[in-house]
Amino acid sequence: MTNDRVESSSGRAARKLRLALMGPAFIAAIGYIDPGNFATNIQAGASFGYKLLWVVVWANLMAMLIQVLSAKLGIATSKNLAEQIRDHYPRPVVWFYWVQAEIIAMATDLAEFIGAAIGFKLILGISLLQGAVLTGIATFLILMLQRRGQKPLEKVIGGLLLFVAAAYIVELIFSQPSLAQLSKGMIIPSLPNSEAVFLAAGVLGATIMPHVIYLHSSLTQHLHGGSRQQRYAATKWDVAIAMTIAGFVNLAMMATAAAAFHFSGHTGIADLDQAYLTLEPLLSHAAATVFGLSLVAAGLSSTVVGTLAGQVVMQGFVRFHIPLWVRRTITMMPSFIVILMGLDPTRILVMSQVLLSFGIALALVPLLIFTSDRTLMGDLVNTQWVKYIGWMIVVLVVALNIWLLVGTALGL
């Protein structure tokens, strides 16, 4: 009886610790449902129905492993990826890493900020510039939570992630996808033509985000409570839950686009405005409004995460610190310039995703090298099969992104 009570007490303590350590992966997972994903998934679903859902499944599994490795680096070494690169690489390499990471963080933020501004424009019927002003104000308010520590911010970002997931449950109810075809699309790989291959590469390229790899290792480096193994076990649960939610959202985006657009003959839907305006007559005003709200929530939360990632990159690589509000003000400027110049926001969004692809390998390669180093990682070092899978992901992602860049440059 006493043993049962002790086991029950230790079980409760383990669950309590696991809950206390939950949160960092929810911040990281937001990077996987940003407006870039909206645009890519909607285009893929409208063009090819359910046939590319399997790409989302595999991209999400790869992203899960990458985020576990990033989180594990922070737990094992109490340093984030940027700090490890600073400590182990020559100074010119470190400066190169810092500059490219800042450029990529700003390019990512451009897509996320404009995505939220488009969302405000669609649901409120205002101009894109007014939407951008609202986005700026909202992100400043969310970032103010950082003054109270990491936990309040984790709760707000986690809440926004759950809101987007709930919004897409509603969208699935409105669009009523075929469950048999949906399941088939998730399980059976299919690439009908060269455009499908290009879109599949785009889905994978938009899924793995370099700035979130840097950020996740910083969110776990100061975790306390329990042993390293217990923190790592709790982190795996954190990643599994958060990334499963993000994966569901991506699947639901593509499935909704397939059910609403592809099978009604609207296969040419390629931007967010079109998607919103077409949803209203096809499904209902409520469905279009829910889409707009989910775009705002995803854009706001991901642009906040992008600002935090930029701060981690600067502090980690060059030990330089600026207040978050200053960084937010600076990184908003490109978005306002794009809007004031009257450039096509969806085209800018796609171009920013292409620029982002340059940074994926630069973040993944050192992450794999460091997490495979026993002197750094101790008992949390990568197993042999994790190394093999990790390098296979690197080769695949790099090859697909090079192919995407070449295709984009040649206008394929």
UniProtKB/Swiss-Prot annotation:
InterPro entries (alphabetical): NRAMP_fam
Keywords: Cell inner membrane, Cell membrane, Ion transport, Membrane, Symport, Transmembrane, Transmembrane helix, Transport
GO CC annotations, alphabetized: plasma membrane
Membrane topology of the entry: Multi-pass membrane protein
Top-level taxon of origin: Bacteria
Subcellular location: Cell inner membrane
Family: Belongs to the NRAMP family.
PANTHER family reported for this sequence: NATURAL RESISTANCE-ASSOCIATED MACROPHAGE PROTEIN 2 (PTHR11706:SF33), SOLUTE CARRIER PROTEIN FAMILY 11 MEMBER (PTHR11706)
Function: H(+)-stimulated, divalent metal cation uptake system.
Protein name (database record): Divalent metal cation transporter MntH
Annotated source species: Citrobacter koseri (strain ATCC BAA-895 / CDC 4225-83 / SGSC4696)
